[in-house]
Amino acid sequence: MKLSTLFMALCLACVTSVSAKNWEAKWITSSECQTRSNSWICFHKSVELPSLEGQTVYADIAVDSKYWLWINGEMVVFEGGLKRGPKPQDTYYDHVDITKYLTQGENSIAVLMWYFGKDGFSHKSSGKAGLLFDCQANGFKILSDGSWN
């Protein structure tokens, strides 16, 4: 019992509420399936990056409901996201170390998002599909906005 309580506390420590962060990124979605249940949406962004020497780079990522993240063809996150609630506007985000996947020069970021569109056991639907991707490092920013495909 003590071990499971410790494990639960460690898991919750890695997930943070969106309202606790000052976001520069914008929520992005697809006009075809913003509110349709069981929707899958792909997002893609190509970015040119300077040298990353000596720094650790994190991306803060929030979705309603689950996501998969690839950088330069390598899977970084498998089934991220999900926790929402207790109100529809309450969103948590994942703080992901993406340093080892990035390179100096051209980088490709792809996110596949699955929007459930309904409430679940530990999930309160926001009522709309969306992605929030915020990566701010020394010398560059990668932010979800209208430039993503």
List PLM regions with ranges.
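An acidic-aromatic loop/edge-strand motif
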Residues: K21-C33, A110-N149
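Aromatic-lined ligand-binding clefts that engage carbohydrates, nucleic acids, or primary amines
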Residues: E53-W70, I109-V111
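Short beta-strands within extracellular/lumenal beta-sheet-rich domains
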Residues: S37-L49, T91-I98
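Beta-strand-rich ligand-recognition modules
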Residues: W68-S125
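Extracellular beta-rich ligand/substrate-recognition surface
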Residues: S31-I41, L82-T91
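A short, structured loop/turn motif at beta-sheet edges
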Residues: G54, T99-S108, Q136-I142
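Sec/Tat signal peptide C-region and signal peptidase I cleavage site
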Residues: T16-A20
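Sec-dependent N-terminal signal peptides
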Residues: T5-C14
